[in-house]
Swiss-Prot record:
Coiled coil: none annotated. Belongs to the proteasome subunit S10 family. This is 26S proteasome non-ATPase regulatory subunit 6. PANTHER family: 26S PROTEASOME NON-ATPASE REGULATORY SUBUNIT 6, 26S PROTESOME SUBUNIT 6. Component of the 26S proteasome, a multiprotein complex involved in the ATP-dependent degradation of ubiquitinated proteins. This complex plays a key role in the maintenance of protein homeostasis by removing misfolded or damaged proteins, which could impair cellular functions, and by removing proteins whose functions are no longer required. Therefore, the proteasome participates in numerous cellular processes, including cell cycle progression, apoptosis, or DNA damage repair. The keyword rRNA processing does not apply. Keywords: Proteasome. It comes from the Eukaryota. Component of the 19S proteasome regulatory particle complex. The 26S proteasome consists of a 20S core particle (CP) and two 19S regulatory subunits (RP). The regulatory particle is made of a lid composed of 9 subunits including PSMD6, a base containing 6 ATPases and few additional components. GO terms for cellular component: proteasome accessory complex. SMART domains: PINT. Pfam families: PCI, RPN7, RPN7_PSMD6_C. It comes from Mus musculus (Mouse). Signal peptide: none annotated.
Amino acid sequence: MPLENLEEEGLPKNPDLRIAQLRFLLSLPEHRGDAAVREELMAAVRENNMAPYYEALCKSLDWQMDVDLLSKMKKANEEELKRLDEELEDAEKNLGESEIRDAMMAKAEYLCQIGDKEGALTAFRKTYDKTVALGHRLDIVFYLLRIGLFYMDNDLITRNTEKAKSLIEEGGDWDRRNRLKVYQGLYCVAIRDFKQAAELFLDTVSTFTSYELMDYKTFVTYTVYVSMIALERPDLREKVIKGAEILEVLHSLPAVRQYLFSLYECRYSVFFQSLAIVEQEMKKDWLFAPHYRYYVREMRIHAYSQLLESYRSLTLGYMAEAFGVGVDFIDQELSRFIAAGRLHCKIDKVNEIVETNRPDSKNWQYQETIKKGDLLLNRVQKLSRVINM
């Protein structure tokens, strides 16, 4: 398992995705007046002299701008950019291609750090054109991907993901190949492709070094969330429940562990309680928030299906008790999902019984075997007639 002291293996936290998370929190009605979150965000803005970002922030969150602070940060930006331009000019006059590239990279990184998106993109692209080494080119593409994630720029992410894949095919190393999977997985979460996200995250659980995106606990939490909605029960058991790296981290994430194991162990009332906690967490997460309603609905269907698979029929009262909810609630839930074709069962309202009517997989397999057997027999008979002739 990657240890916390391996965090230096990550690329620079530039741009810092934690800032995007804080900005998202402050856009929510329940956190709009949260002084602690606002101060944490503003501390990052002041520390990095993020004048361009601060202007955009005040506009998007409808904040009154601190003109003195903005003026101070702009002055600091101008002075640093002047210094970087002088270093670049000196490198172009007196030094070699490598030093020129380093000076260009330093300017691009600074523009990225202060939140000048367009300036940073232009500077990184110029640096990319000056870069020969494949590894350095990939590092620039990872910068562009982080900028894309920070601003959730879909076009920027998709274009540079393809570019990164192409460069890796040319001979990218093992570390960068695995790093790209984490970036792709994070974007898959953002666009609700949970199945692909689960596949990518599970591939990198034991090799994770992308601390520039998130810490390892957050990564494992995301991995559990997407795996539970995307994987069938046998795969969940092999890849998550029995995953040594995941289990090790889950000891320090009791709520996530309970969420995972309560569903797997069929403790449905505990699972529903855990799902309610997960729902609240997802509402506050900048990547999961647009999808939390979909996610919670699908996980409820998943749990209902898992219970129904074990029975031909059961009472509404038993189901309600199993999930720790009222009979009326379970009746309405099942009726809605049955009408939508998401659950294969029917409700006997008179006797308050739920009867499963899902396709019988064993019966289907038996019929398929008979059908294929008949075809094989016919072919053998035709072949025998040809041989006898």
